Design a protein with these regions (language model features):
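A structural signal for short, well-ordered beta-strand segments
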Residues: 46, 106-108, 152-156
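Short hydrophobic-aromatic micro-motifs
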Residues: 56-59, 78, 102-104, 152-153, ...
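Short beta-strand segments
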Residues: 26-62, 78, 88-94
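Short Pro/Gly-enriched beta-strand edge/turn motifs at strand-loop
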Residues: 13-15, 25-30, 134-136
Length: 191
């Protein structure tokens, strides 16, 4: 772990070993990069497989400025957050959220091999729509689609992860009969 991935605020919430699980469970990656002195953060769907834990794959149009820049080997920072619960407190300051988040730093390259792009496409479909099989449940991506899509492989250099769990921590939250309400709305099992 270097200074850039060190958790400074609430270091006791550091859970570095959970980064792969967070990346595997997440649905949206916020991809940060700096291009010509201008910082950008763009949301992407992505593919991450815990059996190949040093890589994340992003895909989009060949016209994507973000993917073009990243594909040239630019440095990248990716953040994935899982919101597990809303924490209500009797005090405004102590309202909070239970979450798990991972931040990764790395560099990227364009995946130009058509066969590898096709495999990544199929894995992404299965990741977001489990159980669907190319050729049975949907038409596999033809060469024309693969040629119009840019796939970028991000090699992870380092990562950090942080989690907050538990209930409210306000000064009156543990006092029975204090005014107001407090508790947790669990968001993990909705839907």
């Amino acid at each position: 772990m270097s200074e850039r991935s060190q958790i400074r605020r609430h270091p006791e919430r550091s859970v570095p070993d959970e980064a792969p699980t967070i990346l595997a469970e997440g649905l949206v990656a916020h991809v940060g990069f700096c291009h010509r002195g201008q910082p950008f953060v763009i949301p992407f769907s992505y593919h991450y497989d815990e059996s190949d834990p040093d890589k994340i794959y992003l895909h989009g149009s060949v016209a994507s400025r973000a993917l073009q820049f990243l594909g040239d080997g630019g440095p990248v920072c990716i953040s994935v957050t899982l919101l597990d619960g809303l924490v209500y407190s009797r005090s405004a300051k102590y309202h909070s959220m239970n979450y798990r988040s991972a931040v990764v730093f790395g560099s990227a390259r364009v995946v130009s091999e058509e066969e590898k792009k096709a495999v990544i496409f199929d894995k992404m479909v299965d990741r977001y729509f489990a159980g669907r099989t190319a050729g049975r449940d949907y038409e596999a991506a033809p060469s024309a689609h693969l040629n119009n899509t840019l796939v970028v492989e991000v090699v992870i250099d380092e990562s950090s992860a942080k989690a907050r769990t538990g209930g409210p921590a306000g000064p009156t939250d543990a006092i029975d009969g204090a005014p107001g309400t407090c508790g947790i709305v669990d968001l993990r099992n909705l839907g």
